[in-house]
Design a protein with these regions (language model features):
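Regulatory N- and C-terminal appendages and interdomain linkers associated
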Residues: 1-83, 88, 296, 301-519
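Residue-level detector of functional hotspots within protein domains
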Residues: 12, 21, 26-27, 37-39, ...
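Short, contiguous strand/loop micro-motifs
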Residues: 31-33, 130-132, 240-241
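Conserved ATP-binding subdomain of kinase catalytic cores across diverse folds
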Residues: 37-40, 45-63, 68-234, 274-277, ...
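ATP-dependent phospho-/nucleotidyl transfer catalytic cores
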Residues: 138, 167-264, 275-381
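Hydrophobic HxD+1 residue recognition
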Residues: 266-267, 272
Length: 519
């Protein structure tokens, strides 16, 4: 590798390793594989700058070797993290089976971010897997995670994708790739499930490892509080406050998902990050026609993780998290359970609050009235009845110059997937109620519509457009389609001639769209 890339002072590498101060049961040393023929597919220069990395002068080959495992960044100490998880409701021991954590990049502003290779070969937690990843799922994560970032939704980021030049054997032989993921951390609900499963009272182990007699669970909780919730401090009820803080971030996150029509697809407890970021973009997708029962994942045959179920599943996951903390809530088990139940109930209140605020903002409403809940519910019911496109319905409302219910349906800018709804008599009646409510506010209707355009995206990563980009990149080696898509997704709230092609739902084919985990 070029000496330029190996010099920390020249390139901004500032890797730290606070996670390895935890008991050794939480990780294992792991060496990433070296790509035999690394080729840079895409590199996120803007994110690199945000991380304090000065890699603008590096050649594509140098970047390919760096993010293809040929030579690790200076200061890297790769590990695989141990964790467990409830997958589709069933508990299992897991761990990073195809990923390694290189370290924590500390930015010039003092922020700390995990840098992780994904698809980097076998680790001590691989079980029977090969630890590899195919190119299409890695590019898919890059596209969707960067789209979520542009939408303002907390998310992990993607720094680079490198083609390894090696085959990956799944149902078919696929080209392999490695993704470099950036995250606030990779601590999950499943990490705490793992800690609880190995014994909350295993203090002897922690004492040997310099944890001051704390159990691994206690050490993990203290570490996570210090890293992500330092405002909690050393208060007596710090672990209850910790749960509340995690639940608050999850309530905000899931509410944001619901407001943009995002369907994660595999909300297992190992895919709930305690930093409050969206993580693991396997079978995720965005909804076209509104239907709460929408499922895209090929493995979710019973709709456990359907769009409308996501808030309930988040609460279920948090209940599993609360169970891991019971011994820290109180010494008395019944008291601890009561504390956990009360804390969990607060999540539902928080989610409903943030979701209501988000949906009211989508309708240009700046102050809450009880009747607004019915206004939102009635619109969603009509959207489902008329198979209205979720994104385009709200965008069409945002672009309206309506002044009365009578002419409303003809005033909005026509957008694909909305005509049947806007032509319906029931919608005209609803629109009259909504417009009257908008005009009651202490801001002008024009201001309300401008506010709506700032929260209702014109462009989302439409599933068929993502598939087009992946097919061109993987089958033909043509990255221009993905480049155009990423450019459109970078400014999702702006309507331009260039992004017009990205604002239509997929053509009707009669076949439901299906996503796959990619593992």
């Amino acid at each position: 590798m070029s000496p330029f890339l190996q010099t920390a002072t020249d390139t901004g590498w500032n890797l730290s390793h606070t996670y390895t101060t935890l008991p050794g049961v939480f990780f294992a040393a792991a060496k990433p594989m070296v790509a035999s023929k690394p080729q840079l597919v895409i590199f996120n220069h803007a994110l690199a700058q945000d991380l304090g990395l000065a890699l603008g002068q590096a050649s594509e080959q140098e970047l390919a070797e760096l993010f293809g495992g040929k030579a690790l960044p200076p200061g890297a100490q790769p590990i695989a993290q141990a964790y467990a998880g409830h997958q589709f409701g069933h508990f299992t021991m897991l761990g990073d089976g195809r990923a390694v954590l290189l370290g924590e990049q500390v930015t010039p502003a003092g922020q700390r971010f995990d840098l992780q290779f994904k698809g980097s070969g076998q680790t001590p937690f691989s079980r029977r897997g090969d630890g590899k990843a195919a190119l299409a799922p890695m590019l898919r994560e890059y596209i969707i995670s960067e789209a979520m970032f542009a939408l303002g939704i907390p998310t992990t980021r993607s720094l680079a994708v490198v083609a390894t030049g090696e085959p990956v054997y799944r149902e078919n032989v696929l080209p392999g790739a490695m993704l470099t993921r950036v995250a606030a951390s990779h601590i999950r609900v499943g990490t705490f499930e793992y800690a609880a499963s190995i014994g909350a009272d295993n203090r002897a182990l922690s004492a040997v490892e310099g944890q001051g007699g704390r159990s691994p669970l206690e050490a993990l909780a203290d570490y996570t509080i210090a890293r992500h919730y330092p405002e909690i401090g050393p208060r007596a009820d710090r672990y209850v406050a910790f749960f509340d803080a995690v639940a608050e971030r999850q309530a905000r996150l899931i509410a944001r998902w619901q407001c943009v029509g995002f369907i994660h697809g595999v909300m297992n407890t190992d895919n709930m990050a305690l930093a409050g970021e969206t993580i693991d973009y396997g079978p995720c997708a965005f909804m076209d026609a509104f239907n709460p029962a929408t499922v895209f994942s090929s493995i979710d045959q019973h709709g456990r993780y359907a769009f409308g179920n996501q808030p309930r599943i988040a609460a279920w996951n948090l209940a599993r998290f609360a169970e891991t903390l019971l011994s820290l809530f109180a010494d008395d088990e019944q008291q601890a359970i009561a504390i956990g139940q009360q804390a969990l109930a607060r999540f539902n209140e928080r989610f409903n609050h943030h979701y209501s605020l988000g949906m009211q903002a989508k309708l240009g409403l700046v102050n809450h009235e009880e009747a607004d809940v019915g206004l939102v519910t009635d619109l969603l019911t009509l959207m489902q009845q008329h198979a209205a496109d979720y994104t385009n319905t709200f965008r069409r409302l945002s672009g309206s110059a309506a002044e009365s219910a009578e002419n409303y349906g003809t005033k909005g800018n026509a957008l694909p997937g909305t005509d049947a709804l806007f032509a319906a008599a029931e919608f005209t009646a609803w629109a009259g109620r909504w417009w009257a409510r908008v005009k009651q506010q202490n801001i002008s209707p024009a201001e309300a519509l401008a506010n709506m355009r700032a929260v209702n995206p014109a462009v989302i990563p439409r599933n068929h457009k993502v598939e087009e980009a992946l097919a061109a990149a993987v089958s033909a080696g043509d990255l221009s389609v993905m480049g155009s898509l990423l450019k459109a997704l970078k400014n999702p709230f702006v309507e331009t001639e260039a992004n017009l092609a990205y604002r239509s739902p997929a053509p009707e084919t009669g076949e439901p769209y299906r996503t796959f985990c990619g593992t």
